[in-house]
Amino acid sequence: MNRCAEAAAVAATVPGSGVGDAGLRPPMVPRQASFFPPPVPNPFVQQTTISASRRLQMFLLGIILLPVRALLVGIILLLAWPFAVISTACCPEKLTHPISNWRRKITRPALTFLARAMFFSMGFTVTVKGKVASPLEAPIFVVAPHSTFFDGIACVVAGLPSLVSRNENAQTPLVGRLLRALQPVLVSRVDPDSRKNTINEIKKRATSGGEWPQILVFPEGTCTNRSCLITFKPGAFIPGVPVQPVLLRYPNKLDTVTWTWQGYTFLQLCVLTFCQLFTKVEIEFMPVQAPSEEEKNDPVLFASRIRNLMAEALEIPVTDHTYEDCRLMISAGQLTLPMEAGLVEFSKISRKLKLDWDGIRKHLDEYASIASSSKGGRIGIEEFAEYLKLPVSDVLRQLFALFDRNNDGSIDFREYVIGLAVLCNPANTEEIIQVAFKLFDVDEDGYITEEEFCTILQASLGVPDLNVSGLFREIAQRDSVSYEEFKSFALKHPEYAKIFTTYLDLQTCHVFSLPEEVQTAPSVASNKVSPESQEEGTSDKKVD
């Protein structure tokens, strides 16, 4: 019997290496509660079902209400424009000083009245709870959940404080001038220093002692369906000043206001809302919350406490989704995956796994190449095996089960990212790569031939007629594979390292299940897998 045959014979004795073995050991890596799926899988989608009777009612009301309300909104905006001009005349777009008192005294009452009239003309009935804090009590309002462009009504009720807005919005005709009258903090998407400048500007205004107007911030940074509170951005909490949480509720039987990434468009929502007899909104001003000394030094901690406080009052859960999840949703759609496939709870995953946007986006490309052929944009065992160019075996099922955290028989993108970071990358060490190379290099000449490669894989996976020529050619540049080529391929494909360590775990379990005299018997495979000498082979397996 040659060396290949000896190694194959030993590998084939491992229980679980054959396809027909019944039962698999449970995953050896414990599930971390912090990686459990979020209570709300997708807060960026809204599906509103409108019955036939409601459609008829909206059509009949809309014949009268839609044109009248649209006309009134247009008239009010035109009436507000001169006051906005007076407020901002001869002022730079990015203010370095607050608008003078005489301008504010003339324009603020008029703009507040017209803004209230506009929302009233659109059919909004507003219920206000709590007391609005003064600039000295709370320089910053934090408003959540942010679910629609109609949330601007909170700004009106709060007395027209300053907003944080995109620089492009200030360039919009008519609306841009009205926005500038609020003395907004403008954010530029092309300026690399914009984030730092925005934080500094918020801090300067919040600590001005009432010289500047209060600032109203939507800390979620994007619109959701109000089913949860997503991660709060720390910008409003960095100054370390007291904030007043503001809750928004829309207690309507038919939701015509929610504006999410998947749902009705801006124009559709305007039409649907204008066709309602009225739209109810509740605005609750909660007690002012001052940061502790620890929270002043840790704005993320401060933001987390305020979010939990608001979520408790709203009786909804919190998740670690962010605006970056929306970007991943768009990327998933461009890769022909369902948009929701890109959701990973970016804030949690990036923090716990030390992954940045570019790293997760790269994993999405990899995931799409595997899952694009499957239904629903999820990886099944067949797609997993096809990607690895290996048959469905118990070793492969072990690895698949480790990735499949919720045991639903498929791997979603979130599970894929966690699996690579938690399972595969730690297993893909220099030592493991060396051990794997030694196992395949049966004749110990420093190269792996296709015969050696096929023989070991066929035996360890329990598939004697396995064709792995395609996988071998992907690794090899010539007729054999050097250690450097083997290492380069392993580093680019960490999934194979986990397959190998899973195989070693199964082999170790088998050794311990044998009688003591058999455990101490030397074998080709044990000598090659263990980096130590033959005499220490058994103890090394225990360490594994």
From Swiss-Prot:
One Pfam family per UniProt: Acyltransferase
CDD domains the UniProt entry points to: EFh, LPLAT_LPCAT1-like
Keyword entries, A-Z: Acyltransferase, Calcium, Cell membrane, Endoplasmic reticulum, Golgi apparatus, Lipid biosynthesis, Lipid droplet, Lipid metabolism, Membrane, Metal-binding, Phospholipid biosynthesis, Phospholipid metabolism, Repeat, Signal-anchor, Transferase, Transmembrane, Transmembrane helix
EC number: 2.3.1.23, 2.3.1.51, 2.3.1.25, 2.3.1.67
Region entry Disordered, spans: 520-544
GO biological process: membrane organization; phosphatidylcholine acyl-chain remodeling; platelet activating factor biosynthetic process
Example of a GO MF term: 1-alkylglycerophosphocholine O-acetyltransferase activity
Membrane topology: Single-pass type II membrane protein
Homology family: Belongs to the 1-acyl-sn-glycerol-3-phosphate acyltransferase family.
Name of the protein this chain belongs to: Lysophosphatidylcholine acyltransferase 2
Organism: Mus musculus (Mouse)
Upper lineage: Eukaryota, Metazoa, Chordata, Craniata, Vertebrata
Gene: Lpcat2
